[in-house]
UniProtKB/Swiss-Prot annotation:
Topology of this chain in the membrane: Multi-pass membrane protein
Residue ranges of the TM segments: 22-43, 53-76, 102-132, 180-206
Disulphide-bonded residues: 46-130, 48-162
Extracellular side: 44-52, 133-179
Record-level GO BP terms: ATP export; calcium ion import; monoatomic ion transmembrane transport; positive regulation of apoptotic process; regulation of microglial cell activation; regulation of synaptic plasticity
Protein name: Calcium homeostasis modulator protein 2
Intersubunit interaction, as annotated region: 214-251
Record function comment: Pore-forming subunit of Ca(2+) homeostasis modulator channels. Mediates ATP release from astrocytes and ATP-induced Ca(2+) influx in microglia thus regulating neuronal ATP and Ca(2+) homeostasis, synaptic transmission and neuroinflammatory response. May form intercellular gap junctions. The gating mechanism remains unknown.
Signal sequence residues: none
Activation and inhibition: Inhibited by divalent cations such as Co(2+) and Ni(2+).
Length: 323
């Protein structure tokens, strides 16, 4: 029984590691949904005033989406790889296809949160109703045999999102709210459909155009994940041991806890890596092969003692990025 449970946990661990991007996007979407719900309850208050409603409603949908998009761009490692590529190599080693591929990857991942925010805002309908209530055509509103009074129609319609207005026009208020929520939710579902189709077509096109097999692409993604994790962990230990050595040289001793003492004793650090080495392993990386053997990262390429762009006649460069 214990062996079966352990095997199931191992399977789940491998599954989640292989789907880390999908899971991360899902967590981002869930976090955005929670933030949107909290915003609607706590911070959203329609001004119910002509001209102000429109600006407030659009701002409530657009500004948070823009902020989430910029945060997504900032938190994407590919963004800073592209910046480093432009800084150190002026992007001269990348053709238009890889640059377009990299930008698409950055923008696609950054769009998860803002699209989720926009969809939830439209499905709830509050911001849309607030923004467009004053623009409803009064002549199109009827309640039984009565029509909407044209006098001060804009001012009255602008107050409907707050549940205000003359008591004898309450039936019109419900009609306006129902009509605008219908439009808002329709746009929300259409946006979901368009995004789903685009994601599906992008995934199909990516795998169709890739010269690598599905298994090799999965291996490449696993390699990059493991390399990043090991590099970060090793860099943390290296910097800690180096800092301990420098503090000891300055004071003549260093106050270490038991774990730090074990690190210093187990991993002696004599020096640091020169800047050219850091530059060599930093930047945009495409899939490359050297004499038929794959090079899965800039660090892998550097470890093989290869320099330059790796596009000699016996080498192959492909416009591919890891997932």
């Amino acid at each position: 029984m214990a062996a079966l449970i352990a095997e199931n946990f191992r399977f789940l661990s491998l599954f989640f590691k292989s789907k880390d991007v999908m899971i991360f996007n899902g967590l981002v979407a869930l976090g955005t949904v929670g933030s949107q719900e909290l915003f609607s309850v706590v911070a959203f208050h329609c001004p119910c005033s002509p001209a102000r409603n429109y600006l407030y409603g659009l701002t409530a949908i657009g500004v948070p989406a823009l902020a989430l998009f910029l945060i997504g761009v900032i938190l994407n490692n590919h963004t800073w790889n592209l910046v480093a590529e432009c800084q150190y190599r002026r992007a001269k080693n990348c053709s238009a296809a890889p640059n377009f591929l990299l930008l698409s990857s950055i923008l696609g991942r950054a769009a998860v949160a803002p699209v989720t925010w926009s969809v939830i805002s439209l499905l709830r309908g509050e911001a849309y109703v607030c923004a467009l209530s004053e623009f409803v055509d009064p002549s199109s509103l009827t309640a039984g045999d009565k029509g909407f009074p044209p006098a001060h129609a804009t001012e009255v319609l602008a107050r409907f999102p707050c549940g205000e207005g003359p008591a004898n026009l309450s039936s019109f208020r419900e009609e306006v709210s129902r009509r605008l929520k219908y439009e808002s939710q329709l746009f929300g579902w259409l946006l979901i459909g368009v995004v789903a189709i685009l994601v599906f077509l992008t995934k199909c096109l990516k795998h169709y155009c890739s010269p690598l097999s599905y298994r090799q692409e999965a291996y490449w993604a696993q390699y990059r994940t493991n390399e990043d994790q090991l590099f970060q962990r090793t860099a943390e230990v290296h910097s800690r041991v180096l800092a301990a050595n420098n503090v000891r040289r300055f004071f003549g001793f260093v106050a270490l806890n038991k774990d730090d003492e074990e690190l210093v004793a187990k991993f002696p650090v004599e020096g640091t890596q020169p800047r050219p080495q850091w530059n060599a392993i930093t930047g945009v990386y495409l899939y490359r092969e050297n004499q038929g053997l794959p090079l899965y990262s800039r660090l892998h390429k550097w470890a093989q003692g290869l320099t330059g762009n790796g596009t000699a006649p016996d080498n192959v460069e492909m416009a591919l990025l890891t997932a």
